[in-house]
Amino acid sequence: MELTNEQLTQLEELASLFCSIDEIALLIDVDEASLRREIRKKTSEAAKYYFRGKLLTQVKLRKQTKLFAEKGSPQAEQTMKQLYERQCNNE
């Protein structure tokens, strides 16, 4: 599946908004099954843009969570602890 640069940029933006693959396919006018296959390959350009989009928003959310944890939010502190443990387990 060949996507244009514009479609890849849109894919990343929509993934950053946590749109589903079905929604993204409809919005960038590609076949849903083909897009899903490309994303599952993990090494395709589509997968790179899809996962980068998701991760960029996750990073923003984690920054906000960290700020709340630093201000004493128990829920944010717990979330940061879980993220830290997950990171350590992945090393």
List where the protein language model places each region.
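The alpha-helix within a helix-turn-helix
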Residues: 23-26
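Short, amphipathic alpha-helical "recognition" segments used to contact nucleic acids or chromatin
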Residues: 1-19
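Residue-level recognition of short, well-ordered coil/turn positions
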Residues: 19, 43, 73-74
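Exposed alpha-helical structural elements
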Residues: 10, 34, 45-46, 60, ...
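Amphipathic alpha-helical protein-protein interaction segments
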Residues: 55-91
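Short, solvent-exposed alpha-helical "recognition" segments
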Residues: 2, 36-54
